[in-house]
Amino acid sequence: VVIVGSGAGGGVAAAVLAAAGQRVIIVEKGVYRRHREYNQREMEMINTLYEGKGLLTSVDGGVTVLAGNCLGGGTTVNWAGAFRTPDYVLRECAEEHGNPHFLHPDYQEGFDFVERRNAVTTELLRHNPQNAALYEGAERLGYRVKDIPRNMKARPGLDPEQFWRDQGFSPLGDANGSKQGSVETFLRDALAQGAQIMP
């Protein structure tokens, strides 16, 4: 089986198919960088890790799209927010667009599976002063406020303060491997089952 892309979709597909005994080859056009190569220099990382050097737009220029052009795709360059598709969107897809599988229990089990493997949690969360003020202000105004779950895992031996500082740089690649994107999770699983990656 040839899988094109190594991000959120490709990584999961590769791991599941390899575990099922399929011979899997993952084709990725983007670069691979080791953790130590994520230097947190904004322009260099954007130029290296993002499709179109971060300037990818729709044909009419009305929408800017930030897409990963690296091993792990968007899971390498996202900000680690990991929330489920809202129920109202799933209902719309099922009822108005003829895709009933979005409401099937197996689909929800898929969310559970991915969240477990990606260590999705709100426990490793600390608001900076700006976000804390926004959170508190919204609560005082009567808005419902919730923390956004993130796919993060504290690394043993990593200074907790360094962990928190590094989170601000996670869209530029995670130098410590705390963000549990495709490279840290599903691609490792796929490789352990014999899958291969072709750059």
Summary of predicted features, one role per range:
Residues 1-96, 100-105:
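N-terminal glycine-rich phosphate/pyrophosphate-binding loop and immediately adjacent elements
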Residues 100-199:
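Conserved redox-cofactor binding core of oxidoreductases
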